[in-house]
Amino acid sequence: FMAGDRVAVDRTAYGLRLSPMRWWGYMRWGTSPVPRGEWVAFNDPSAGGQDKRYIDERDVFVGFCYAVPGDSLWIDSLGKVYRNRPRDHRPCRVVELPRRNAYVTLTPDNMQWYCRMINLHEGARAAVIADSLCVSGHFVSSFRFSHDYYWMSSANERNHADSRTFGFVPDTYIIGRLSRILYSWDTEAPWYARLRAHRTMMKVGRENTYKPRGGQSPSGRSVGVAVSVQNQNP
């Protein structure tokens, strides 16, 4: 994606999330899981419940869905993410994406990651103490999560502006599927050349057929069913 892209979002693709959430709370008409490989618009999950704004009032990010609830991922020391164990058996941290109402086993390797997710999205206070996880005053060896969680990727292993930085994305933060670029506006070009005509009504495909230039996961501002991409990719 490029700065100035105006991207249409199908808000009914995974069930229509009702807005404003300050009136209804979280409600969704119809529910459909997000498939792997689709480009998705979602609200910024980095602050979780610590952000006093309602979820639908937060910044809008886009990324492609790399992993779904129940998947296991291997993350090496360089931040590369794999859906299968690397063949060279390099040291990796293994994390499982939580499913709604399913228990996840906690280990010294993964509890820091889950501790952050519990504090942000599960409405509980958690802390790692002496290689053990303490949740709401009790030491636990597993935890039952109340949301489905997704891994959103920037499509570039060197750019960590994705779930490697802000963590798993809960289902409550999902807005919809990116369907096409309505138009693209280059604000740095002369006035007569600002419209990137070749990008007008460009269809957004799955990750294996459509990748952003430079791979940066852009953020934007939600207006109706469109996202205005504001970040410039290298």
What is the predicted function of each stretch?
Residues 1-234:
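Extended hydrophobic leader/signal-anchor segments used for secretion and membrane insertion
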